[in-house]
Swiss-Prot record:
<dbReference type="InterPro" id="IPR022649">
    <property type="entry name" value="Pr_cel_nuc_antig_C"/>
</dbReference>
<dbReference type="Pfam" id="PF02747">
    <property type="entry name" value="PCNA_C"/>
</dbReference>
<dbReference type="InterPro" id="IPR046938">
    <property type="entry name" value="DNA_clamp_sf"/>
</dbReference>
<dbReference type="InterPro" id="IPR022659">
    <property type="entry name" value="Pr_cel_nuc_antig_CS"/>
</dbReference>
<comment type="function">
    <text>Sliding clamp subunit that acts as a moving platform for DNA processing. Responsible for tethering the catalytic subunit of DNA polymerase and other proteins to DNA during high-speed replication.</text>
</comment>
<dbReference type="Pfam" id="PF00705">
    <property type="entry name" value="PCNA_N"/>
</dbReference>
<keyword id="KW-0235">DNA replication</keyword>
<dbReference type="GO" id="GO:0003677">
    <property type="term" value="F:DNA binding"/>
</dbReference>
<dbReference type="InterPro" id="IPR022648">
    <property type="entry name" value="Pr_cel_nuc_antig_N"/>
</dbReference>
<dbReference type="InterPro" id="IPR000730">
    <property type="entry name" value="Pr_cel_nuc_antig"/>
</dbReference>
<comment type="subunit">
    <text>Homotrimer. The subunits circularize to form a toroid; DNA passes through its center. Replication factor C (RFC) is required to load the toroid on the DNA.</text>
</comment>
<protein>
    <recommendedName>
        <fullName>DNA polymerase sliding clamp</fullName>
    </recommendedName>
</protein>
<dbReference type="GO" id="GO:0006272">
    <property type="term" value="P:leading strand elongation"/>
</dbReference>
<dbReference type="GO" id="GO:0006275">
    <property type="term" value="P:regulation of DNA replication"/>
</dbReference>
<dbReference type="GO" id="GO:0030337">
    <property type="term" value="F:DNA polymerase processivity factor activity"/>
</dbReference>
<keyword id="KW-0238">DNA-binding</keyword>
<comment type="similarity">
    <text>Belongs to the PCNA family.</text>
</comment>
Length: 250
């Protein structure tokens, strides 16, 4: 069986963040909570989410895989209000996931499930030379600046600085977060440099990765030369991890 009750607002954030990259996902349910990982259709990005049982008000889950149409789930969750309780209930016989919004009014939906098994996708255990923790709002603003110039972006670590750089045929954009200078906004919360590095990425993917973040969310970004960038952040106890392959420049 599977039945869980949680805050609609928090669950919506997790689903929105995940569905920005993938349309289908397999919820791996057990007594400890929900885990899921999926690749985007182009196999450029991997998304992983983990919702431990502690983030739910009530939780019961046996070991099983639940194939979810994320686009359908996202549309239904969008109808929920932040003050409503959200109840997820698996109907094994009908192969459906029942979704209930509960306040002084009760609204019920159900979605058909895919017949899938666990993909066994895991976030690879990569040792990164560098990492930064940065407020999502500051990172997103730098992406918006870069978008004016090109559809690719370079992330650099060098000389105690985190640099977000984009160059077109005629124009360029550069945002520098200097760890040696005190920042009143505390945009750069943590900086760990092992070696100078630079990697280039598809800007559209990075925008999708961060589309559902709040300005004050803290992004943990792991970097190395020509390595996938790993971005982690939390939503009210749930953990989201994104991995994006670099663009190898000739």
């Amino acid at each position: 069986m599977f039945r869980a009750t949680c805050n609609t607002r928090d669950f919506k954030k997790v689903i929105n963040a995940t569905s920005n990259l993938v349309d289908e996902i397999c919820f791996e349910v057990d007594e400890n909570g929900i885990k899921a990982s999926a690749m985007d259709p182009s196999h450029v990005a991997l998304v992983s989410m983990e919702m431990p049982k502690d983030v739910f008000e009530e939780y019961e889950g046996d070991i099983q895989d639940i194939g979810i149409d994320l686009e359908a789930l996202k549309k239904i969750i969008a109808r929920g209000r932040g003050d409503e309780k959200l109840i997820l209930d698996l109907d094994v016989e009908k192969n459906k996931l029942n979704i209930t919004f509960k306040s002084n009014v009760t609204r019920k939906f159900s979605i058909a499930l895919y017949d899938v098994s666990s993909s066994n996708l895991k976030v690879p255990d990569i040792e990164y030379p560098n990492s930064v923790s940065i407020k999502a709002g500051a990172f997103v603003e730098a992406l918006k600046d870069a978008e004016l110039v090109n559809d690719h972006i370079t992330l650099k670590i060098d000389e105690n600085k985190f640099v977000i750089y984009s160059k077109g045929d005629l124009n360029q954009s550069e945002t520098v977060f200097d760890n040696s200078i005190d920042d009143d906004d505390n945009a750069l919360a943590d900086f760990n440099m092992g070696e100078a590095s630079r990697s280039t990425f598809n800007l559209a993917y990075l925008k999708d990765l961060t589309k559902s973040t709040a300005a004050e969310d803290l992004l943990k970004i792991y970097l190395g030369s020509d390595m996938p960038v790993k971005i982690e952040y939390e939503v009210s106890g749930s953990k989201l991890v994104f991995l994006l392959a670099p663009r190898i420049e000739s």
